[in-house]
UniProtKB/Swiss-Prot annotation:
Residues 3-38, 75-110 form the EF-hand domain. GO terms for biological process: cell migration; mitotic cytokinesis; myosin filament assembly; sorocarp development. Transmembrane segments: none annotated. It comes from Dictyostelium discoideum. Ca(2+) binds at residues 16, 18, 20, 22, 27. Keywords: Calcium, Metal-binding, Motor protein, Myosin, Repeat. InterPro entries: CALM/Myosin/TropC-like, EF-hand-dom_pair, EF_Hand_1_Ca_BS, EF_hand_dom. Myosin is a hexamer of 2 heavy chains and 4 light chains (two regulatory light chains and two essential light chains). GO terms for molecular function: calcium ion binding; cytoskeletal motor activator activity; microfilament motor activity; myosin heavy chain binding. This is Myosin, essential light chain. One of its GO terms (cellular component) is myosin II complex.
Length: 150
């Protein structure tokens, strides 16, 4: 689902607190999320560098919104599920908690140990096997659990 020009303008107006036609570059992630995108922290840092100023205007937001590398939550969910399925050689739909911790703290847009500890409080880990349903994990992350920009 794409945001309309009116929705982008409305979003911009909400973040343009003093009505000067500019929004703080620190709000770029929140703007994109409110428009249905799901930028990672790495995406946000790259956008700040690309913008190269402390503020941006509506045309910059429109241009950034159109970038295909800023995924929607649905695209991000599919990408994460595909990655977990590739690791799941036996097709059980699970990953061991210890392996998950290691992956989340070392790969890609990785999380701190404290962030992983917080995540583990929100997900279900099988007390017998130590396994985590990766579909449930992905749903938790994509549904808005505030991890590293998700």
């Amino acid at each position: 689902m794409s945001a309309s020009a009116d929705q982008i303008q409305e979003c911009f107006s909400i973040f343009d607190k003093d009505n000067d036609g500019k929004v703080s570059v620190e709000d770029i992630g929140a703007c994109l999320r409110s428009l249905g995108k799901s930028p990672t922290m790495a995406d946000i840092e790259a956008l700040k560098t690309e913008i190269g100023a402390k503020e941006f205007d509506i045309n910059t937001l429109k241009s950034i919104y159109k970038k295909p590398n800023i995924k929607t939550p649905q695209e991000q969910q599919k990408e994460m599920l595909d990655a977990f399925k590739a690791l799941d050689k036996e097709g059980h739909g699970t990953i061991q908690g210890a392996e998950l911790r290691q992956l989340l703290t070392t790969l890609g847009d990785y999380l701190s140990t404290a962030e992983v500890d917080e995540l583990f409080k929100e997900i279900s880990v099988d007390s017998t096997t130590g396994a985590v349903s990766y579909a449930s994990l992905v749903n938790t992350i994509v549904s808005g659990y505030p991890l590293g920009g998700f």
